[in-house]
């Protein structure tokens, strides 16, 4: 993922795929990839399914800079994850069942399905508002435990991995396992 042209095209592809899969509405969610000097991330206000050129993404460093004002509001969260891991890519999405489960569960979502248990283990739920140090610290702490994905309570999921396909698969699995758990719990009432 070293070529900037390839990077924005990869971000555009996976942004469209997230939206068409129902894992985000087109306006919400973020995608980034690690670069040699930092990360490339969607610009603020750009819809995930409407990334059409390199101008729709921006490269920023791993530490705050003047470019942060035009980068995604989730840039601090992405930085925190990159600084805490060796991840090469991150997807932040708003999968509905994962968000619901984050409001119903205490500290983690425990998958019940035979795919989610070995693939995800448990999914930590972290608190903190978008762009806050609290969220950044909680994400870094959760990722230091070696998890594949984390859900920010009432907000959305973060998946960090080796590439955007890996992150997409984790995001889809978090949503699938959350949906199965929600429906199972509902049926048992």
Question: For each predicted feature, which ranges?
Answer:
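Glycine-rich flexible loops
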Residues: 1-189
